């Protein structure tokens, strides 16, 4: 049986030993999650947006990973966040990937920044600087609770309520019209997961980091299994 080919967006950072040499990379949990779920993982490096069509044609599904803030110019705002952490070329390339994946009817799964970017690409906006959602605990520590819509695939995996890790200081503000919220933080109503409500788009996005919880609990591996084999 042919394994699904899952394209994982890559980030860029300096090599710690040689800061004049950059690395294209994705955290290994994304690759491990795809592999353990039965898929083949391919990294998609930040590239010219004209190459998005070819990249998407090579894969069966797309995963948008975390990283920098989404440049607020894409939702018609000026930056007023406490950090100036942007990567414009990455935003542009990944928006081209989203557009092509939608055209080619390839499912999309997103995590953290990826979910924020998806919302912006579809016409939504972001809270630029929120509090109490960047934990100072180990990455697999379950930091706060989450309430899940009972009429969602997430509820089949996690139940109506669970706890999640949290590493973000931006979140969805105005929701894109093609999306619906399927999970929130019960304390402050922060959006923690969304899915497509459009028949033309197969999409699931989460705000937490299941790739860091693969050895912590089975639900997060089941999420990757759903993405790789069913989404």
Regions found by a protein language model. Give the residues of each.
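Short, well-structured active-site flanking segments
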Residues: 125-128
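Short, basic/aromatic recognition patches
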Residues: 166
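Active-site-proximal beta-strand elements of phosphoester/diester hydrolases
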Residues: 204-207
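Gly/Ala-rich beta-loop-alpha elbow adjacent to hydrolase catalytic centers
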Residues: 110, 114, 119, 123
